[in-house]
């Protein structure tokens, strides 16, 4: 049915269990925006001050780079990272994301630390490209999904993945 699905999101703001179905071909593009960081800070009921904002930004940016780094081993590995991150962060805030959490996730994935170190420099360039593409699309809200069909494109702003998957499943049945 679909030729491509691009999903822009921010870590700690989404539920990633839906993406592990392998039914639809998703390209996950993390972005870090000031609004998303503010939303994360508010969702976790953290102090509303500049110091906390900067700390949340730092942790979200670090986790995003770590996800991008692991994703160089393949999209499936990247999705497994997101699911492991969700599991590790239950009952915690983004401020709790530290190297110990990363090491635990890499261990769960049987991901070689030397491969992580080797790919890390490329993650920053990949994140910059993802951010640029997000802004080129003229979008301002997260999450946002672009579904590129054979003859059409659909933009879905600020909907939970469960609703997007329901829509895609209905479209697949119609075809």
Regions found by a protein language model. Give the residues of each.
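Structural alpha/beta surface segment adjacent to cysteine/selenocysteine redox centers
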Residues: 15-93
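C-terminal cap of thioredoxin/glutaredoxin-like
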Residues: 3-23, 99-175
């Amino acid at each position: 049915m679909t030729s491509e699905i691009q999903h822009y999101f921010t870590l700690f703001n989404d539920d990633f269990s839906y993406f592990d179905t392998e039914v639809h071909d998703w390209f996950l593009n993390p972005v870090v925006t000031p609004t998303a960081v503010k939303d994360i800070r508010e969702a976790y009921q953290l102090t509303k001050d500049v110091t906390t904002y900067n700390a949340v930004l730092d942790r979200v940016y670090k986790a995003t780079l770590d996800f991008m780094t692991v994703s160089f081993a393949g999209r499936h590995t990247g999705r497994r990272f997101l699911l492991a991150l969700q599991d590790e962060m239950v009952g915690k805030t983004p401020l709790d994301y530290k190297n110990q959490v990363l090491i635990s996730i890499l261990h769960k994935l049987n991901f070689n630390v030397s491969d992580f170190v080797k790919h890390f420099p490329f993650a920053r360039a990949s994140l910059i490209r993802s951010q640029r593409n997000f802004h080129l699309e003229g979008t301002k809200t997260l999450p946002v999904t672009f579904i590129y069909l054979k003859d059409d494109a659909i933009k879905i702003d600020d909907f939970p993945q469960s609703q997007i998957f329901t829509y895609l499943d209905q479209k697949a049945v119609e075809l």
